[in-house]
Amino acid sequence: MAVAILFFSFALLLAIGVPVAYSLTASALATLIYLGLPPIVVVQQIAAGAGSSSLLAIPLFIFAGEIMLRGGISERLIALASALVGHLRGGLGQVSVVSSLFFGGVSGSAIADVSAIGGAMIPQMVQRGFDRDFAVNVSITAALVALLVPPSHNLILYSAAAGGGLSIADLFAAGMLPALLMTAVLMFTGWMIARRRNYAVEAFPGFSAVFTRLVSALPGLLLVALIFIGIRAGVFTAVESAAIAVVYALLVTILIYRKLKFADFVEACTGAARTTGVIVFVIAASAVFGWLLAYLQVPAAAVDALRSVAENKFAVLGLIVAILLVLGTFMDLAPMILICTPIFLPVAKAYGIDPIHFGVVLILTGGVGLITPPVGSVLFVGTAIGKISVAQTLKTIWPFYLAALAVVILVSFVPAISLWLPAALK
C-alpha cells in the first residue's frame, strides 16, 4: 500500500501541474506519514542528497558553459562547422548538427545547446530558403547530441544517483561514440530530407578557410580535451576539472576571444545559479524519494517482477527502454535519472548489464523525452525560437524522431558502442 501511495501521489501531483521537486517531496512526506516514520527523515535526506561533494562538479561545469556561451564560442563553433560540412546537401542543417556536437563539449546541456545553436542557426536557415519546420526539427533533435559529450552533467548526475561508485572518466568515454553515432544518423536524415525538398547546395569554402576557423575555435574545443584527458589520466578529479574549466573559460573568453564583458559575466552567474538551483532542488527532493524506494525494497521487487516476465537480459533491457521512453514523455531528464537509476540499475546489474552502458542508455532514452510532448522542454524551446507551433513541428519531425529512436535501440542492444572506448583507454 505504501508503494502505491508513493507512486500514485507523485503521478497525481505531476498530472495537475505541480513542479517535479515539490511532487517528489510531497509524495514522500505523505508516504512517511502513512508508514508512521518521523518527518525529520525528509530534512535528513534532503541535506544528505544535496550535500554530496561529487555534485560540486555540476554547478561548476554549468558555469563554465555559461561563460563560454556568452564569450563568443558559439559563433566560432558554428563558423568551423560551416566550413567543414556547409557544402553538403542541406548545408546549414548539417552545420546545426555538427555545431551541436562541438557545443555539447562546452555546455553538456541540451537546453543550452538548442538555445545557443538553435538561436543562431534557425533564423539563418529560414533566411537562406530552408523551410521553418526543417530548421526547427534539425535544431531540436541535434540538441540530443549534447547530452553525452563530455562534460555532460547528466553523466555526473547518473554517477551520483548510482551511489558515486562509477568512474566519471569511463562515463565520459562511454558517451563519445554514441554521440558521434547520433550526429552521423541525424546528418544522414537531414541530407535525405534536404534532397527530397531540393534545398540548394553551397560551395566548399576551401581548406584555408577550414584551417582559419579551426584555429579560431580551437581554444574553446580544447576545453573538452583538457577535462577528459585530465580526469582520464588521474591528474585531477571531476570536481577539480570543473573548477579548472571555469578558470580556463574565463581566460579564453577574456584574454583570447576578448568578448566577455562584465554584463555578460553577471548574466553567466545568474544563468548558472538559476539552472543549478533547479537541479539541486530536484536532487534534494529525489534523495527522500530514493530513500523511501530503498526502505520499501522497490528495486528488489522490480528485479523479481521483470524476472517473471523475461529471462533474457536483452528482453529485460528492451522492457526498461520502453518504460523509460514512456516516462520521458512527462518527466524531465534530471528527475528521471535520479528516480529511475535506483529502481532500474539493480535490475540491470542482476541481468549482467554493465552499469556504464546502462547509464548511457538511460540518458539517451530520457533525452528522446526532451523532444516529446507534453513535457518536452527542448521541443518547446526550439519551437519558441523558430516561431512555429508545436503541432506544426510534430507533423514533420517524425523522420528525425525515428532516427533518434534507431540510435537508442542500436546503442541499447550493441553494448560495444558505449563500452569499447572506455576499455580501449584503460
Annotate each PLM feature.
Residues 1-426:
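Alpha-helical transmembrane segments of multi-pass membrane transport proteins
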